[in-house]
Amino acid sequence: MSESAPMELIWYGRTCVRLRGKEAVVVADPYQSVVGPTGRGITGDIVTFSHPDDAPVARGKPKGKLSRDGTTLIPSSLDAAFVLDGPGEYEVKEVLVTGVRTYRDDAKGSEHGKGVSFVLEVDGIHTIHLGEIGHLLSEEKLGDIGAVDIACVPIGGTLSPTKAAALMAQLDPKIVVPMTLCDDDGDCAEALAKFLHEMGAEPVTQPKLSVTASSLPGETMTVLLESRGKQA
């Protein structure tokens, strides 16, 4: 990629997103059967799991690679990727990654378990992948996260649309990317509509987000992405 090429962010459904920068490709929360629009497996240099305790586990499939937690299988197309699934600070292929402990509920994980939100610095752009977070952030957590440009936020999970909007007010990103989680399309549409109303947003759906550090908007905008993933 040339130096002027934008970072690309593609959503593959649920909490799976792929960030392509100049030096590396990051795939967050890949599920075992994820493939791209062409039917080929998605590839990447770095894989992050925001909820390793409950990530999809393939059973009866010969191909796959265990992540560091020892239970989660990642797609074979990501065999060579560097896997991150816990809190901490990392640098891989010029990508700075900060994993911050979060929870999938508002009860310190006692109901739905722990999670990890990852801040990914790619091409000078700070993107936070919130995974399946279920709560607002404390001042301490906000300090650990720092300033973010793009926020990928779950909609339709344990985090209500109102709390999701409040979380975005806490983080104050330039771009908000909703990730719908519901199993029922109707529930997803309702939750997304409520979130967009809370945000005061009327976004247009697009296949991917392409952005550079210099092209980030001055005020927060919400971008709806088409799900590019499909079951293998």
Short names for language-model regions:
Residues 33-83, 143-152:
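Active-site metal-binding motif and surrounding structural segment of the metallo-beta-lactamase
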Residues 2-35, 111-131, 150:
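Conserved beta-strand hairpin/beta-sheet module of binuclear metal-dependent hydrolase folds
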Residues 1-22, 80, 86-89, 94, ...:
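Zn-dependent metallo-beta-lactamase
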Residues 10-12, 85-86, 111-112, 175-232:
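Binuclear metal-ion centers of metallo-dependent hydrolases, dominated by the metallo-beta-lactamase
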Residues 30-32, 51-53, 102-104, 131-135, ...:
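Active-site metal-binding loops of divalent metal-dependent hydrolases
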Residues 38, 104-171:
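Active-site-proximal loop/helix segments of hydrolase catalytic cores
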Residues 19, 47, 97, 132, ...:
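Divalent metal-coordination and catalytic microenvironments
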Residues 61-127:
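Portal/gating segments that form or line small-molecule/metal binding sites
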